[in-house]
């Protein structure tokens, strides 16, 4: 039972951080990087 509880807690702790902190900043920064790369090095 304790292992199940720990696993659940880790999943719960990991999900919010990924969705609240990584999700909004991830895609946004990723898009910016891709745009910057495309602008600096346009595809032939």
Curated annotation (Swiss-Prot):
Coiled-coil-forming residues are: none
Print the keywords alphabetically. Answer: Acetylation, Activator, AIDS, Apoptosis, Host cytoplasm, Host nucleus, Host-virus interaction, Isopeptide bond, Metal-binding, Methylation, Phosphoprotein, RNA-binding, Secreted, Transcription, Transcription regulation, Ubl conjugation, Zinc
**Subunit comment for this entry?**
Interacts with host CCNT1. Associates with the P-TEFb complex composed at least of Tat, P-TEFb (CDK9 and CCNT1), TAR RNA, RNA Pol II. Recruits the HATs CREBBP, TAF1/TFIID, EP300, PCAF and GCN5L2. Interacts with host KAT5/Tip60; this interaction targets the latter to degradation. Interacts with the host deacetylase SIRT1. Interacts with host capping enzyme RNGTT; this interaction stimulates RNGTT. Binds to host KDR, and to the host integrins ITGAV/ITGB3 and ITGA5/ITGB1. Interacts with host KPNB1/importin beta-1 without previous binding to KPNA1/importin alpha-1. Interacts with EIF2AK2.
Per the record, what is one GO cellular component? host cell nucleolus
Modification(s) after translation: Acetylation by EP300, CREBBP, GCN5L2/GCN5 and PCAF regulates the transactivation activity of Tat. Phosphorylated by EIF2AK2 on serine and threonine residues adjacent to the basic region important for TAR RNA binding and function. Phosphorylation of Tat by EIF2AK2 is dependent on the prior activation of EIF2AK2 by dsRNA.
Q: Any miscellaneous information on file?
A: This virus is cytopathically active and was harvested from the brain tissue of a neurological AIDS patient.
- Annotated Basic and acidic residues bias: 26-36
Q: Which GO terms describe its molecular function?
A: metal ion binding; RNA binding
Q: What does this protein do?
A: Transcriptional activator that increases RNA Pol II processivity, thereby increasing the level of full-length viral transcripts. Recognizes a hairpin structure at the 5'-LTR of the nascent viral mRNAs referred to as the transactivation responsive RNA element (TAR) and recruits the cyclin T1-CDK9 complex (P-TEFb complex) that will in turn hyperphosphorylate the RNA polymerase II to allow efficient elongation. The CDK9 component of P-TEFb and other Tat-activated kinases hyperphosphorylate the C-terminus of RNA Pol II that becomes stabilized and much more processive.
Motif Cell attachment site boundaries? 21-23
User: Annotated region Disordered: where?
Assistant: 1-44
Q: Where is this cross-link: Glycyl lysine isopeptide (Lys-Gly) (interchain with G-Cter in ubiquitin)?
A: 14
Give the Polar residues compositional bias ranges: 7-18
This protein's species is: Human immunodeficiency virus type 1 group M subtype B (isolate BRVA) (HIV-1)
Family statement drawn from the similarity comment of this UniProt entry = Belongs to the lentiviruses Tat family.
Q: What does the entry note on its domains? A: The transactivation domain mediates the interaction with CCNT1, GCN5L2, and MDM2. The Arg-rich RNA-binding region binds the TAR RNA. This region also mediates the nuclear localization through direct binding to KPNB1 and is involved in Tat's transfer across cell membranes (protein transduction). The same region is required for the interaction with EP300, PCAF, EIF2AK2 and KDR.
| Designated name of the protein | Protein Tat
Q: Where in the cell is it found?
A: Host nucleus, Host nucleolus; Host cytoplasm; Secreted
